[in-house]
Structure formats: structure tokens, C-alpha cells
Amino acid sequence: MRINPTTSGSGVSTLEKKNPGRVVQIIGPVLDVAFPPGKMPNIYNALVVQGRDSVGQPINVACEVQQLLGNNRVRAIAMSATEGLTRGMEVIDTGAPISVPVGGATLGRIFNVLGEPVDNLGPVDTSTTSPIHRSAPAFIQLDTKLSIFETGIEVVDLLAPYRRGGKIGLFGGAGVGKTVLIMELINNIAKAHGGVSVFGGVGERTREGNDLYMEMKESGVINEENIAESKVALVYGQMNEPPGARMRVGLTALTMAEYFRDVNEQDVLLFIDNIFRFVQAGSEVSALLGRMPSAVGYQPTLSTEMGSLQERITSTKEGSITSIQAVYVPADDLTDPAPATTFAHLDATTVLSRGLAAKGIYPAVDPLDSTSTMLQPRIVGEEHYETAQRVKQTLQRYKELQDIIAILGLDELSEEDRLLVARARKIERFLSQPFFVAEVFTGSPGKYVGLAETIRGFQLILSGELDGLPEQAFYLVGNIDEATAKAMNLEMESNLKK
């Protein structure tokens, strides 16, 4: 699908005086606006309220039309705070949906829902913009070939591989390495696939958004010296913003990603943190618009809203958008309508484990809880599938034996089980990997491990060829040859100490 970009400015900041209306009612972030007969705006059109507040400060509030009420009135939802607005203020219909800048000019910059830069680094080139509301690619444009999206991260590629153009749910609490994993994926897609990334911060903490930006600058994902060489564009609509902004910021990020896919023909990574906040914002807007709530108080249009976002995230014949979405599960209830609706769209889940993080095994991806629809022999091949299954079986058996080991000790196990435990511990450590973006913290150079190398390494451990090597040799290394070399170094060091 090709975009037909407009050449107007981003958001709704530059306007002609066309089709003016008047504010007739304000209820929080919801505005009712009256227009002259025969000049009603379309649904999703951007409106701008312009004027001055009681102390003479200029007001410029963007809204989006949600309902046509009759009697020449529309109901719109504000994208920014409505403090200072009064009845009778002039409202301008822009005649089009919210449009945001797209293309290379967005890389290394932070935007709000309207596509306006919020990082104090000056204006952005707005010669090419695109509306945030678009239809999903037509069937004929889709790339239906099932292919693996190689990340260079062993535990992901082997046990829960990502689909090119697929959607992945990322589950993890605070402090288990979610941000570092996200940054490594951004780094690897740029190096291995020549792709770029778009990060959509939907309804999360402003502090976390700031921390992510600072860490990206520190790790080189955002290049301060030459912004154009950055690998990511950031779009934030944080939890202090009105529900309208939080509901639409995901679409703004997606629109930027679509341009890289359709026009630049690149592989794009789209991060959404957090997809639950998108649903939550939609629920707030639905209540403000007076719709009858559905199950558990959610909006009746929940599935439609989720589908309209998720169906645009796909592979076309030009390129792909692979989406990684952090999923918050309210009260750990997986049957809650918000996560349940999200699960229907996911191709893989990556679960981060606090237990593994406590052991110092990073990335702390749980190899048994993480799943993928791609892990089938006809897609990944027999060799990959068999290796992954044997790794999972070994780790599952080790998990079952841990209670016995804790009570009776390793000596009480059979010879066969002792061997299995030793191999499982090697596998657990070999699933750790030094990251490029964590070099500044760990001092270990980052490693990108190809899928073939990953499979070969785990096959050697499972076959017993490396039973004689110490388990610490497998910790934080790249491929299996590095583990062998590390074992030799450890042996030499221990001999020198003697």
C-alpha cells in the first residue's frame, strides 16, 4: 500500500480561517460545537479552538470529531487540556484528520499525539505528513509468506521466535529488563535488517519515558551528534494527558511506522507501551461520549477499536511492521476483556521472569512461559523445532527436580537425572547473552547470534559433547565457540592459581 502524503504542516497548527463554528458546551475533555447549516465536519476531522483565556494567554486546543449530534452540532474530544476554554469561542474545522510528520525527519525526535516535537531540539521538517486514520492494507497487498524475524537474541529466536510482520506481547514487571530488551531489539533491527523503530509511549509514566530517552542516547540508539543517524522515533502520550491523546497516540506512532514500511520499503519495529492504556483511554472516551458500557465497564466498541489498530500492523509486499506490545494485566486476570481482546491478535508472547533476573541471567526471558505460533516444524524446520522441544523438556524436568534437590541435595538423584540437571544449568546460563546496549554497564561487548549458530550451540550441549566444561563458561557469551574458549581460559586461570 502506498501512502499519498499531504504537504501541509504537522498536527493542526497552521490553519486558514475556513468553516468556523462555536463552542456551545464543555464537559471536561468533551466539547460540543455548533456549525453553520450545511457545513458540518466529518467524523475524525481535526478541529482547533483558538482564542485567549481570562488572563489573555493564547489558546490553541486540537480536538477530534467523534459524534454528529444533529441540530448542526458535533461532539469532539480534546487532545490537550481544556482549561481556559469558554462557550462562544471560535472553532475551526481543518477539513481533514490529524496529520503528523513522517519519514527520516522523525528519527531521533520525540513527538506528541499531534506530531509536534516536544524535545526542545527545534522544528521538524513537515514537508511530508500523513493522516493518522487510514484503512488497513488490502488483502492483495499482504505478504502471506510465514517467515521468522531474526532478532539475534538466542532465547527469543530458539524458543519463542517472532513472526515477520507479527505481533508480540511482552509481559514483565518493573526492573526485570523490559527497557533493555526493547533497546537491544531496536539496535539489532537497525544493524541486521537495516530497519528503523518507532516507540509509542501510550499512557505510561512521564519519568519512564524520560529514562528511556536518556538510556537510548547513552547507548547510541539515538545519536545526539548526528540526529539523522538515529534508529528510532519516539511518540509519547503519557498518563497525565487527556484520554483523547492517550487513545490516539498509538495511531500516531503507527502512522510513522507505516511510512517507513510502505514508502521506504523497510522492516520496522513498532513498540507500544502499554497496549492496555490504549484500551483504558478508549473506555474513558466512550463513557464521556455517553455510550452504554459493556462487560466490566469497558466500551462496547472495544473489539472494533483494537482491530482497527492491530490490522494495520502487518507485512505487505513492500516491507513489514513487527510490533512488540507491553501488556499490563489488571489484577493478574487474563480473562479481563482488555488483555483477552489483545491476546486474540498476538503471534508470540515473551514473558520476563523475576526469578531469572534475580539469578543475574539476562535477558530474563522465561523459556517455559514464552510461546510462539511460529514454533512449528513446517515453519522453522525439523532441526530447529526438535532442538527447541528438547531444550524445553530438559528445563521442565530440571524445574520438577528442584524441590527434591532443595530438600535432599543433588547426591540423592539418579545418575541420569544428575546429568540432566548439569545440562539444564548449562542451557540456563547459555540462554543469557551480552547486549550491545548494556556494554556501558556490563563491560562485556555485545553479541548478535545468528539462528544457525544458536541451534548448533544448544545441540552440542544436549548431545553431551560439552559435559566436561564448567557451567560458568556458558554465562554471558555469544556462540558456543566462545563458551569453549572461555572454559579453556577458566582452566588456565585455575591452574595458575594452583
UniProtKB/Swiss-Prot annotation:
Domain of life: Eukaryota
Record keyword Chloroplast present: yes
A single cellular component GO annotation: chloroplast thylakoid membrane
Membrane topology note: Peripheral membrane protein
Stored SMART domains: AAA
GO MF terms held by the record: ATP binding; ATP hydrolysis activity; proton-transporting ATP synthase activity, rotational mechanism
Pfam family, one: ATP-synt_VA_C
Enzyme class, broadest EC rank: translocase
Subcellular location: Plastid, Chloroplast thylakoid membrane
EC number: 7.1.2.2
Keywords in alphabetical order: ATP synthesis, ATP-binding, CF(1), Chloroplast, Hydrogen ion transport, Ion transport, Membrane, Nucleotide-binding, Plastid, Thylakoid, Translocase, Transport
Function of the molecule: Produces ATP from ADP in the presence of a proton gradient across the membrane. The catalytic sites are hosted primarily by the beta subunits.
Family: Belongs to the ATPase alpha/beta chains family.
Protein name, as recorded: ATP synthase subunit beta, chloroplastic
Gene label: atpB
